[in-house]
């Protein structure tokens, strides 16, 4: 029983001028983000309004832009845009043409206030109505990249675990779900009864998810090939096998193993081709390893000094050695590098009574900043281009939700909420790229 409890505890423990124009203006401490209005110059049916609504939602789900839309104006020429009443810095002008096969051609122009020329233009052809959301996310990525210089993330995916009947002795249902970044288009890619699915993590090419689970009474680490649904068990060590994550090149995974029926776990790197192990840590409970973007170091959680904190280890050290990230942090769990390797996002408990929030650690200056303000926020995962963080928030009634926050902490969004205590949402993982 002790090993099972320990296993479960590990699961829980666990363009240059254009860009210059868009530098946010700071006024009395408030960042004024450029306002983008999305309008159509024709409304052939409900399709344009549906697409434009998704574009607006996308452009509000970030830290660099804000957006609205309007159906008041059918603008036939760019000279007729009512800039004064719109109060916009930019207009995304969309024109929809429907053909005999009920498919659409969509023309998109980006216009700037006080500029008589189009900044950018693109056309999407032969779009079926079933691809409405995909089209909208494509347009959003295009607009976001042109107006900020950064990659959009609106065609990325989220993987997460949904647990039904979580407190039942039998009949607990675990589902691994993949959805669009905004929670739409959910697909169950793996379903198990009474065998937990935990800590899913994507491969960098987006083809595989690695996760830990119980099967036949023992823990193991598995890979799921997303396209085929093929599941492969890759570890079968006694005791705890948990918290796997892929290396950037996809050739290795980092994971936590007890290698026996012990409460202590250590971090290992496994070569997926040979199954050879390299040990990274030597004492304490060590878990939740994540590779740095360059693959040269691993960040993880350890309680070796009496309470959980974040440690960093080199993957190239001849002998296991690691160092604490910062003595300023009281307790910390579940670290993740940002894609540029400059920050670490983690679950932070700043005092015994503070609860847990999602925090950002700046590696350059050592500052720690909470970016959420809940009492039970956990499981952060960073978007592939570093702008946003998805995480789990649990309220005082024990209801969990999948939420999103910008890395600066200014923008918060809900993605999915479990509206009763009989469902839990756990372990989100953001895909490494757009699909």
Swiss-Prot record:
It is found in: Periplasm. Residues 1-20 form the signal peptide. The keyword Transmembrane does not apply. Keywords: Cell cycle, Cell division, Periplasm, Signal. It comes from the Bacteria. GO terms for biological process: cell division; protein import. It holds the Pfam family PD40. GO terms for cellular component: periplasmic space. PANTHER family: PROTEIN TOLB, PROTEIN TOLB HOMOLOG. The Tol-Pal system is composed of five core proteins: the inner membrane proteins TolA, TolQ and TolR, the periplasmic protein TolB and the outer membrane protein Pal. They form a network linking the inner and outer membranes and the peptidoglycan layer. Part of the Tol-Pal system, which plays a role in outer membrane invagination during cell division and is important for maintaining outer membrane integrity. Belongs to the TolB family. This is Tol-Pal system protein TolB. It comes from Francisella tularensis subsp. novicida (strain U112).
């Amino acid at each position: 029983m002790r090993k099972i409890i320990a296993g479960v505890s590990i699961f829980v423990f666990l363009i240059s001028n254009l860009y210059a124009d868009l530098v946010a203006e700071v006024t009395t401490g408030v960042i004024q983000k450029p306002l983008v209005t999305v309008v159509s110059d024709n409304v052939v049916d409900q399709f344009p309004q549906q697409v434009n609504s998704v574009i607006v939602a996308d452009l509000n789900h970030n830290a660099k832009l804000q957006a609205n839309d309007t159906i008041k104006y059918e603008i036939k020429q760019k000279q007729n845009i009512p800039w004064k009443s719109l109060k916009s810095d930019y207009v995304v002008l969309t024109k929809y043409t429907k053909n005999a096969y009920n498919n659409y051609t969509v023309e998109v122009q980006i216009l700037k206030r006080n500029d008589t020329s189009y900044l950018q233009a693109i056309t999407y052809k032969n779009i079926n109505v079933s691809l409405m959301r995909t089209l909208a996310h494509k347009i959003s990525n295009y607009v976001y990249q042109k107006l900020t210089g950064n990659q959009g993330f609106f065609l990325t995916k989220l993987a997460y675990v949904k647990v039904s009947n979580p407190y039942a002795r039998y009949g607990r249902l675990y589902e691994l779900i993949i959805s669009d970044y905004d929670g739409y288009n959910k697909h169950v890619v793996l379903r198990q009864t009474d065998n937990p699915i935990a800590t899913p993590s994507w491969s960098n090419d987006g083809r595989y998810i690695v996760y830990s689970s119980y099967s036949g009474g023992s823990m193991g680490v598995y890979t799921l090939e997303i396209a085929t649904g093929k599941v492969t068990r890759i570890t079968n060590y006694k005791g705890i096998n948990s918290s796997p994550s892929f290396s950037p090149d996809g050739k290795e995974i980092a994971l936590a193993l007890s290698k026996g029926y012990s409460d202590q776990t250590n971090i290992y790197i496994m070569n997926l081709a040979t199954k050879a192990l390299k040990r990274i840590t030597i004492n304490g409970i060590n878990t939740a390893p994540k590779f740095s973007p360059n693959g040269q170091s691993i960040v993880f959680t350890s309680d070796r000094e009496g309470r959980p904190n974040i440690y960093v280890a080199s993957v190239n050290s001849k002998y296991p050695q690691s160092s604490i990230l910062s003595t300023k942090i009281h307790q910390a769990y579940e670290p993740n590098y940002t894609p540029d390797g400059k920050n670490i996002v983690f679950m932070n408990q700043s005092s015994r009574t503070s609860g847990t929030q999602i925090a950002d650690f700046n590696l350059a200056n050592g500052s720690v900043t909470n970016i959420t303000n809940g009492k039970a926020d956990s499981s952060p995962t960073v978007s592939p281009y570093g702008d946003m963080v998805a995480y789990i928030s649990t309220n005082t009634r024990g209801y969990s939700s999948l939420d999103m926050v910008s890395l600066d902490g200014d923008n918060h969004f809900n993605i999915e909420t479990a509206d009763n205590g009989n469902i839990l949402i756990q372990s989100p993982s953001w895909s490494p790229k757009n699909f």
